[in-house]
Structure formats: structure tokens, C-alpha cells
């Protein structure tokens, strides 16, 4: 059957889906249909009957607005995505939301839409493939051997994150990464020459990529030859495909008119005529389905891989068991027992250290149990303390390690980690200063939206970093992380809370975690075994009064020590004071009402929250009758002790505030 005719099935479904929804982006799917047909029918190794097959090729639609392209491909190939699902494009609770979302339709490898993040996720997937291959493959047994393919448009290339990711991909020699640039010269505002005149091929050559320029995106033979050349090259490849946006539309192709709006009934009829597509809306002939179906070939490819894996399992039974455990996202059998013992030992052996150092100690202890750890930092390893004795850096010619030097690429790092998590086989963690999570915020939001694991170590968490000043001192960042749905945020007060936070982050597979650590040393707090267990609840009674409290001090991180000292002074003066350590407000909020009431009794309205972050966040816990000792402005450049005094983080100020409240 004519390849163009098979590609036209994508064009028809895409324009019909957008028309039915009365919103969407038909131009990119219609322009890239020929490329998609060649890639999916002649190259992509996948099995529609098992979208989770470990050694499948990954496909990422980085220009996620063209979502009808991937929905059409999944439907035509035989995935569990019906024609009714396509008719429900962009409708409430459908499997086909406006941008592709991970966890809705089978075969969607990542959520895309915020431009540039798809290509960056793909870099992470390609890194995970290369690292897993280095760790598990043996001579004659290539059980990890797959490609990551990406479609991306001009918008992805304009976004700065594409530079961060593609630069690193070239440095690390990710030869299994193949990207297709949809070079149609059109963005929402019109022809891109006025705002995007880069020499993109030269840009990627400078990154160390293999570049195939000037491929006719509507010539199946040229596309096929380019893919074959890309697969044979040891470098990541950019295939520059010249396409016509809205291909087939007689009056709107080649213009921004077809980028982000339905073609309209009249133009769709004209397009059907132009393409020689004589079938009605959402009608696909059986012979077209038969040509497109990947069920039989996909099952055969997976069966062949299963045979390879059986041979590997016979030769390397322990490695095979470890591979299965890791790709299934399971922790080692001895994890719970050993991790809990590590925490108990820390409580029994107090140390007054910075929580960033406590974090490194947790990595040292837990890392020995977790070969799946894949760490990293955005060029701040000596400050974030993210390397431990078992850390081994990934290098282009040796990917058997477990640590990535991301360079100064906070956004790229975080979105790459999303790709690593989505690929499977690793527990990724990265790091930067808390202030610079701002650069990476949207990628962490995407992790929360996708319900995937992404552990970020954010150090230098307050004015406590001192002399570097307000450019580096976070104020509103902790609150913004806490306010992000499905984000775990922890600000521990000592080495024990730090280890508990790390343990929970490692165990939590369905959400990202922000671990917020101090630069300065923090005093370890005494606790009973029950209190240690209660840390996981996010908030707990650290020090209590004799009888019912008349005042509750709530604190996090470096301010817990301050709250304890103030409570001791107030208690000595006859006040009944409870200290609540609340390292994770979101974990505390998830506890049942009885527990929350036991910790923060509603009839004790005299409450003070103490945190070197934005003050307004804490009204939810202290009420309008309470007080907050927090930040209401940016910081200053000065030694940390002077700043804490200037902004009121002193025992004297807490005590005086308490007395005013109780007066």
C-alpha cells in the first residue's frame, strides 16, 4: 500500500479530532505524518500489547501540542486507544487530553506540552538506557539495547532548556538518541525568520551531534535513509526534516493559520479531496488498519527479547534477578530492616552537623543498599554534598557509574531526571541551592503532575547562608514547593529527621520530593523511639509541657533548635509550652484528623510558627490569633548570625512574642 496513503490516515484523524473538539493543533501532526509513518512502521521496536516491555524503543513527542499525532499513531498501531477515545479528544476524563499526559493513554512515555522538556526527558531516557546497558549487558548478552526517538519543533529549540539538554547529550555521547526537527518555519506568531534565525545544524554540530541536514520530510525514502544513518552513528543524531505545516490543506498549509485552530468543515472537505482520502470523519478502512497494526510484529520482537533474556538469566541469574527488581521499581528485600536500623543508630549517636552533611551521611548509608541510585548536582557537588564514597561519575566512554555531573543546568538536570525516572531502573537524585530551584521549577511541577519519583536536594536553605546575600538566600521558595500539588517537601532539623526524609523520598515512587537542607550546623534533638517513628508523619510533638499546653511553638529545620531553647526558658518561667517539629507540612496534612488534633489541639490558639522562610505560609497552622516569626522581605549580605538576629530569629524575640501572645 502507498506510504503516503498510510500517512494520510494520521492527517485525517488529526484534523477530525481537532475539528470535533473545536480546539487543538492540526498543523504539526499533518506536517510530520510522513516522518511518523516511516519511523513507526519501519523502525520503532514496540509492542502495543505490552506498552511496558522493558527493552522497547521510547518515542517522545516534545512538541506536545501536536498530540493528535501520537494519539493517531497509538490507535492505528493497535494500542488500547479506541476511535471513541480519539473522538473524545480534549474532553473531561478522556484518555486523550489536549497535551499527551503520562498515565492516560498507553504508550505515552512522558507528559509533554511545556516546550523543550520532551527533548530533555528523552535525553534522560537515553542516559538511563546507556547506563543500564553498561551495568547489565555482558558479552553476547545485550539485554538493554533500544533507541529513544524524539519529535520536536522550532519552539522546543528556542527554549533554553533544549540547549542545556542537547549540549550534555553531545558531551556524553548518547548514540541511541535520535531527534527529528520539524523544520516548518512556522510558530504561533507566524513565519519564524523574525525571531528564530539560528543555524540549527551548526549549533548541534557544535554540541558534538551527528547532524543530517535538509531531509525532505515528505519523502519516505529520504526519511528512511536518514534514520538508518542515525542508527549507525555513535553520536546522538539530529535529523533536520523540512516539512510543510498542515500538509494537504489547500488553503492553510504552510501558514500559522493551521497551527493552533481547527481547519473548519469546508477546509477539511477540501483537504480530503486534495489528499485523495475518500472516507468520512474518523473512518479508517480495515486494510489501512492491517498495514498499520504493530501487534504481531511487536509480540514477535518482545518474544525474541524474552528468549535473549532467558539465556542471560541462565548465564547470570543474580544479575537477571537484580535487573527485574530494578526495572519493576522494587526496593531490595532487606531495605526496610536495614534503613530503619540506620535511623535508630543515628538517634543513638548524636551529632551536631549541618543537615546538608547529614544528607551526605544518609547517602553514604543508604547508597550501599541501592545500586539503582543515580545521583548528580548542577555543578555544586562540594556544596550540596551529593557525592558519597560509592559515587562513580558517568563519562562518554564509561557509563557504568552512578553519578552525573550536570554542569550549571538546573532546569535541564531536573527534566533529565524525569526522563531517567520514566525510563525505569534507577532512583534519581539531583541537587542545587534552594534559591536556584527557581530555574527548575516547571520540571519539578511536571514530575508532580506525572506522579513520578524525582528527588531534589536543595541546600543553603535560608538567610543562614549569609554573606552571599539575597541573590542566593531563598525566602518564598519553600512555600512555593509546599503549595505544589503532589510534591513532598521536607526541611529536617537534624541528622535523624534528614535520614527519615531520605528514606521516605526513596520509597515514594508516585511523587517528587524536595529535601531542604542547611549550610550551618544544627543541634541534634533527643527523641524516644515513638517520636522517631512519628517523624514520618510530617509533624510531631518534640517537647511537651506538664499537662495541657497553653502555648505551641511550631518550627522547621534550623529554627527547631531555636524553638526548643525558647521553650526551655518559658518553661523555667512557669509557662506550659509544647514544641512541634514540622519537617513536612504536606505529610502532616495527610494524617487523620485525630492525629493532627493530638499534635495541634484546636482549643490551644496561642501558637507561634518559626521558620526562616516567607511568613504568610504559616497562618494555616497558627490561625489569625497566632504569631509568625518569619521573613517578610528579601535577605541581606552579612554573616548568618547577624542576619538571624536582625530578622528576629533569636530566643529573646521568641520569648517576648510568646509573652505578648499569652498576656
UniProtKB/Swiss-Prot annotation:
Keywords: Calcium, Magnesium, Metal-binding, Thiamine pyrophosphate, Transferase
Cofactor section: Mg(2+); Ca(2+); Mn(2+); Co(2+)
Reactions it catalyzes: D-sedoheptulose 7-phosphate + D-glyceraldehyde 3-phosphate = aldehydo-D-ribose 5-phosphate + D-xylulose 5-phosphate
Important for catalytic activity (site feature) positions: 25, 259
Binding residues for Mg(2+): 154, 184, 186
Binding-site list for thiamine diphosphate: 65, 113-115, 155, 184, 259, 436
UniProt binding sites for substrate: 25, 259, 356, 383, 460, 468, 519
Signal peptide per UniProt: none
EC nos: 2.2.1.1
Record InterPro entries: THDP-binding, Transketo_C/PFOR_II, Transketolase-like_C_2, Transketolase-like_Pyr-bd, Transketolase_bac-like, Transketolase_BS, Transketolase_CS, Transketolase_fam
Family the entry assigns: Belongs to the transketolase family.
Protein name: Transketolase 2
Organism of this sequence: Vibrio parahaemolyticus serotype O3:K6 (strain RIMD 2210633)
Amino acid at each position: 500500500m502507498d506510504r503516503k496513503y498510510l500517512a494520510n490516515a494520521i492527517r485525517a484523524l488529526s484534523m477530525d479530532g481537532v475539528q470535533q473538539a473545536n480546539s487543538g493543533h492540526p498543523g504539526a501532526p499533518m506536517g510530520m505524518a510522513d516522518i511518523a509513518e516511516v519511523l513507526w512502521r519501519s523502525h520503532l521496536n514496540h509492542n502495543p500489547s505490552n506498552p511496558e516491555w522493558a527493552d522497547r524503543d521510547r518515542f517522545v513527542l516534545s512538541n506536545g501540542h501536536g498530540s493528535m499525532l501520537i494519539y493517531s499513531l497509538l490507535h492505528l498501531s493497535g494500542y488500547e486507544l479506541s476511535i471513541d477515545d480519539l473522538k473524545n479528544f480534549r474532553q473531561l476524563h478522556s484518555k486523550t487530553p489536549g497535551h499527551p499526559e503520562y498515565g492516560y493513554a498507553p504508550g505515552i512515555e512522558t507528559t509533554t506540552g511545556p516546550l523543550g522538556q520532551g527533548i530533555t526527558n528523552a535525553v534522560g531516557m537515553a542516559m538511563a538506557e546507556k547506563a543500564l546497558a553498561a551495568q547489565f549487558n555482558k558479552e553476547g548478552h545485550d539485554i538493554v539495547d533500544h533507541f529513544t526517538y524524539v519529535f520536536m519543533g522550532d519552539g522546543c529549540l528556542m527554549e533554553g532548556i533544549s540547549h542545556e539538554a542537547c549540549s550534555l547529550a553531545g558531551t556524553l555521547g548518547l548514540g541511541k538518541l535520535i531527534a527529528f526537527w520539524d523544520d516548518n518555519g512556522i510558530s504561533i506568531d507566524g513565519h519564524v525568520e523574525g525571531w528564530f534565525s539560528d543555524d540549527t545544524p551548526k549549533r548541534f554540530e557544535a554540541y558534538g551531534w551527528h547532524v543530517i541536514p535538509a531531509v525532505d520530510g515528505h519523502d519516505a525514502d529520504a526519511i528512511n535513509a536518514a534514520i538508518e544513518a542515525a542508527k549507525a552513528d555513535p553520536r546522538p543524531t539530529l535529523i533536520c526534516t523540512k516539512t510543510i505545516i498542515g500538509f494537504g490543506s489547500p488553503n492553510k498549509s504552510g501558514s500559522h493559520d493551521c497551527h493552533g485552530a481547527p481547519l473548519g468543515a469546508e477546509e477539511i472537505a477540501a483537504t480530503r479531496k486534495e489528499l485523495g482520502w475518500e472516507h468520512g470523519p474518523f473512518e479508517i478502512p480495515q486494510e489501512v488498519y492491517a498495514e498499520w497494526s504493530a501487534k504481531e510484529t511487536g509480540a514477535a520482537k518482545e518474544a525474541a527479547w524474552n528468549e535473549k533474556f532467558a539465556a542471560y538469566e541462565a548465564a547470570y541469574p543474580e544479575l537477571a534477578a537484580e535487573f527485574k527488581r530494578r526495572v519493576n521499581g522494587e526496593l531490595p528485600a532487606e531495605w526496610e530492616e536495614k534503613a530503619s536500623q540506620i535511623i535508630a543508630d543515628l538517634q543513638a549517636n548524636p551529632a551536631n552537623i549541618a543537615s546538608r552533611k547529614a544528607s551526605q551521611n544518609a547517602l553514604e548509608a543508604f547508597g550501599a543498599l541501592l545500586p539503582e541510585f543515580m545521583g548528580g548536582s548542577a555543578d555544586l557537588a562540594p556544596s550540596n554534598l551529593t557525592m558519597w564514597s560509592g559515587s562513580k561519575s558517568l563519562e562518554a566512554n564509561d557509563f557504568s557509574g552512578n553519578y552525573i555531573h550536570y554542569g550549571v543546568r538546573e532546569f535541564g538536570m531536573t527534566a533529565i531526571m524525569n526522563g531517567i525516572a520514566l525510563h525505569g531502573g534507577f532512583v534519581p537524585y539531583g541537587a542545587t541551592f534552594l534559591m536556584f530551584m527557581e530555574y527548575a521549577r516547571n520540571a519539578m511541577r511536571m514530575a508532580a503532575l506525572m506522579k513520578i519519583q524525582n528527588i531534589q536536594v536543595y541546600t543553603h536553605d535560608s538567610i543562614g547562608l549569609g554573606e552571599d546575600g539575597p541573590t542566593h538566600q531563598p525566602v518564598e521558595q519553600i512555600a512555593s514547593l509546599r503549595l505544589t500539588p503532589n510534591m513532598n517537601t521536607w526541611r529536617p532539623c537534624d541528622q535523624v529527621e534528614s535520614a527519615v526524609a531520605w528514606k521516605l523520598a526513596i520509597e515514594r515512587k508516585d511523587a517528587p520530593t524536595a529535601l531542604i537542607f542547611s549550610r550551618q550546623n544544627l543541634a541534634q534533638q533527643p527523641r524516644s523511639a515513638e517520636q522517631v517513628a512519628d517523624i514520618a508523619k510530617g509533624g510531631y510533638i518534640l517537647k511537651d509541657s506538664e499537662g495541657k499546653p497553653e502555648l505551641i511553638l511550631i518550627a522547621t529545620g534550623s529554627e527547631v533548635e531555636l524553638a526548643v531553647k525558647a521553650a526551655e526558658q518559658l518553661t523555667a518561667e512557669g509557662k506550659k509550652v509544647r514544641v512541634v517539629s514540622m519537617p513536612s507540612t504536606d505529610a502532616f496534612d495527610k494524617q487523620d484528623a485525630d492525629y493532627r488534633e493530638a499534635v495541634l489541639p484546636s482549643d490551644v490558639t496561642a501558637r507561634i510558627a518559626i521558620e526562616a522562610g516567607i511568613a504568610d505560609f504559616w497562618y494555616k497552622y497558627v490561625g489569625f490569633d497566632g504569631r509568625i516569626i518569619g521573613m517578610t522581605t528579601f535577605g541581606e549580605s552579612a554573616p548568618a548570625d547577624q542576619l538571624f538576629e536582625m530578622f528576629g530569629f533569636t530566643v529573646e524575640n521568641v520569648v517576648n512574642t510568646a509573652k505578648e501572645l499569652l498576656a
